[in-house]
Design a protein with these regions (language model features):
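Walker B catalytic acidic pair
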Residues: 285-286
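Conserved N-terminal helix/loop that builds the PLP phosphate-binding region
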Residues: 1-104
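Conserved core of the PLP fold type I
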Residues: 72-279, 289-291
């Protein structure tokens, strides 16, 4: 793209830029772009899916080998030496797509985090077969370990990690997480009907709609980002958070639909508010955090 065209794009809003790039991409296969800035991206990552399906085939082999008396039925996995059988399976099908990914994932986790190989593969097999209630029910042990390390890497970057440990809860998706959070805040009397919450706007539509539902009946105060300031939140808007009647602040970062991350300066200002108001609940939706 010519620099003159880039300069022209710099004058457009994020929505106009997105639409312009999509229009460019549709003119030629050579210009096809990966678009992750929407609810349903126009692409999928094939490597992990290939590995997923190969893992499923191994899990079925395990199941069939332990319950061979009935055609069409399988049994529970056996943990003892299951990692050895897994590696034998990978050696047998090493030319299949996804197998090398599985081997590398297994070796990385067992080497980097000193995880017992049999315990790891057994969890994978039981999980992909779906033949048991998960323990713990919020997220499987090694799945949580892996996801936590990934989140620490992507969300903390070069910054020091916060003190202490945080737990992860695996859910069906971002909107489902919102429902669970609203229900949890209500059930624990942290938010009650008639309370006021602040919402960083513009924002993903359900954040606007859900507080108005009869189940929650919450009042909303919008903390409006300024398009003229590259979608940062002005000090005058952040001042609204100093109102003690505001019980919580819901924020999407990077933003949706603007697709812009908050600057470090803005984040520090929010942190200052949180330090002044330890009673203020901060809820951040970081679904696009890995793109920041």
């Amino acid at each position: 793209m010519k620099r003159t065209d880039e300069k022209r794009l710099e004058t457009l809003s994020p929505f106009e830029v997105k639409n312009t790039l999509i229009d460019l991409a549709q003119h030629s296969h050579e210009k096809t772009m990966i678009n992750a800035g929407r609810g349903n991206p126009n692409w999928v990552a094939t490597a992990p899916r290939e590995a997923f399906f190969q893992l499923g085939m191994f899990a079925l082999e395990e199941s069939k080998s332990n319950f061979s008396g009935y055609e069409g039925f399988g049994g529970m996995g056996v943990q003892q030496d299951i990692s050895l059988r897994f590696l034998q399976f990978c050696e047998k099908y090493e030319d299949q797509e996804g197998v090398q990914f599985l081997i590398e994932a297994f070796q990385f986790i067992t080497d980097q985090y000193q995880v017992d190989g049999d315990a790891l593969i057994y969890e994978w097999v039981e999980g992909i077969l779906g033949n048991n209630y998960p323990v713990p029910d919020r997220m499987l042990k090694y799945s949580e370990l892996i996801a936590r390390k990934y989140i620490e890497q992507e969300m903390a970057g070069s910054q020091p990690l916060p003190a202490g440990k945080f737990d992860l809860f695996a859910v069906e998706g971002g909107t489902a997480a919102m429902v669970y959070i609203f229900n949890t805040l209500k059930s624990n009397r942290l938010l009650n009907p008639g309370d006021t919450i602040a919402i960083g706007a513009p924002i993903f539509t359900p954040y606007i709609e859900m507080p108005e539902l009869e189940d929650y009946a919450l009042n909303k105060v919008e903390i409006m980002a300024d398009e003229a300031s590259a979608w940062q939140i002005p000090d005058s808007e952040l001042e609204k958070l100093n109102d003690p009647s505001v019980k919580a602040f819901f924020l999407v970062n990077p933003s949706n639909p603007a697709s812009v991350r908050l600057s470090d300066e803005t984040l520090y200002k929010i942190a200052e508010v949180a330090n002044r108001r330890p009673d203020l609940i901060l809820l951040t939706d970081d679904v696009y955090g890995t793109f920041a």
